[in-house]
Amino acid sequence: MGNIQDLDPHIPNKLGEWNIFADTAAAKDVIASGVPLTMVPLDVTKHIQVTEQFYNELSDLAERNGKTAVSLAYNLIKALKIAFEKEHPEINFFDVYYLWDPFAAMVALEPQIAKIEEKYIKVDLQTGKTEEVSGSGEGIGHVRVAMDIAKPAPEILHHLLEAIASLTPPDMKHEAVTVPPFTLFGSNKGGTPELANRDFKPGI
């Protein structure tokens, strides 16, 4: 995933995206390795929001399809929603929750849903920032970067619903699980470290 410093001038990024911030040295090595990479910045995933309409459509599909991948996806998002609302009752879940990783996976499988450009990218070991630079050099990678979505967000979400509905994993078992307390906005009561990119609201 990652993010590009000031990819969107309306959303200033002063901190590194969490996945890169957590291990900047490894991120720098991977990006500069020469391995073919496609980066889907956090800035771009903000377009793919878990809307109330998407949530309700997923709920309806789960009810009609029984114990399938649809119900698994719905139960996962439902559990996240319940846990989030317990920790942050003052915040509307649908205002701040995005399909960060699912959209990155979608781009990996179907890159045509994103507007992709080739960029020279480096990772700053001190700040964790992922930045575009003017040319190649030591510690710099030549990376394909998703700069924006290539289709309307509702169309992408509908396509995701269709893809999930088409999956029929064998022997799926649904068991009650307890989602531990978590937060998107700083440390929770359990002492989880504060995540990076706190200035990026909503959708960190």
What do these predicted ranges mean?
Residues 9-10, 22, 34:
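Conserved phosphate- and dinucleotide-binding cores of soluble alpha/beta proteins
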